[in-house]
Amino acid sequence: LGDTPERIPEVLQRYQALRRVDVLRLQNAAWNAMEWFENVGERYADQLPPEQFMYSMLTRSQRISHENLRLRDKAWLEGFERWFAESAGLQLPAHVPAPPPMFTPYTVRGVTLKNRVVVSPMAQYSCVDGLPGDYHLVHLGARAMGGAGLVVAEMTCPTPDARITPGCPGLWNEAQRDAWMRIVDHVHAHSDARIAMQLGHAGPKGSTNAPWDATGADHPLPEGNWPLIAASALPYLEDGAIPRAMTRD
């Protein structure tokens, strides 16, 4: 390509285009490793168990995954998995392979999850007057029966004016309490998953359309709006309602 001086700029430009992404990946891996040594390595070197510290160090660049380690040193990783499983409370016979760390129990403040798979909150915008119904029972129940250790229900609002949209769930009256209890009882009866709730407040994003509304997601409702309160008197979008800034009173 560079057989004449006039083509040198073109060659350099093509070389940069081909190599730029790979160079960025290497730089990012180096940056991650540097931050690990500056933070994890310095703060926890004398606190973490040797096995955990070594695993953290080997994966510090975020370019070497759990299964990558198996390709590099299968015996070491199997020993680490057994140590991790026993640290999580599993008693495994010598002939039984240890499960991957994701599928070991995890205990938080006296609550033990059967594994470390967590279903994150997923906003559904499908309530009427904040009341979860059959849709939510099926949605959350299916995730619980799918094998996750913990299922977290979508953002639930403690007051009507804390909602993002009219379809957001709430927990400000007894009817909603009973509806949530029905879902919790269903999860407990048909799975060994734990279920939790994400409590939240819309802030400046409140009183807006559902994502699929023809007038545009996150834009103010055409009617039936409610007053907003937020950390500051700034709208969520330029054409959004201006919330009242919170005070200590």
Language model: regions and residue ranges:
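Active-site oxyanion-binding pockets that recognize sulfate/phosphate
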Residues: 5, 133, 170, 177, ...
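Non-globular sequence segments
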Residues: 200-249
